[in-house]
Each structure stands twice: as structure tokens, then as C-alpha cells.
Amino acid sequence: MTEKGEPVEYGELNILYQDEYFVAIDKPAGLLVHRSFLDKHETQFAMQMLRDQLGQHVFPVHRLDRPTSGVLLFALSSESARDMNKLFIEGTITKRYLALVRGFAPESFFLDKPLKEELDKIADKFATQNKAPQAAQTQFNCLHQATLPIPIG
């Protein structure tokens, strides 16, 4: 949504790579990967947009949060999606993010904080209540720090 509450029109997705098994797109910030009960008013989703653009079903291999832009990988068959998902679960494949942040950070630090699923009372009414936390480990490395001579606040 724009600042005026109007829906954003994303147009065609930028395809970064495509072969017979996978397609990678440049997901813009603000675009959901797929439909969600948590955002019922949204009408545009990367999965449906790419399906319409390619004229075939696509299967998300991973997700990026709505405010996150970056490379989003889709499989072109359920078998390819399953095989790639297995590699993510085994830790054979990892994701790497670059972020521009405000404030000061140490040169390097490691965060080991398992993700506990917080179920939504409506959307997850029938979901498993006692699901084990998902492993989540992140190594942070500061590539550069700068001070801008611009007052903020």
C-alpha cells in the first residue's frame, strides 16, 4: 500500500535466472510471497504474479518477509521444490543477506536463537500446538561503518 492507502502495482517481476528446474526473481520490498490469512486485503503475490508471467505453476523454495527485497527462488515442479527444501533442511544450502542498518554494531557476532512458532488464533486454528522450535543461527559481520553529517530526529 502507498502512503495514501492505495495498492501498489508491481508490474512484471524481474527474472534474474531461469533454467528447466528453477527461476529466481528480484522480489521488491512490500510484496508478499504468497497469500496469507494475516493480510486478507492484499491482491498481489509473487507466486501468482510469476505463475501468470511464465504461464505455468511455480513452487516457492523459501520465503522473504514482506518488507525484505532480494532474490527469491521458485521451483518449476513440486519434485524440484521438494529436493531443494531437503537441502535447506540439511543445511547444505544457506541464505546470505546484506542489510543497511542505522546505529552501531560490533564488528562481528553470532546469534543462536531458535524460532518458536506463534500461532494465530484464526489462521492456525488446526495447526500443531506443540511444534518444536526451528533452529536459527546467524553470523553477523559488519562490512563498513560510516557517520553521516546529517542530523536526524
Model regions and ranges:
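RNA pseudouridine synthases
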Residues: M1-G153
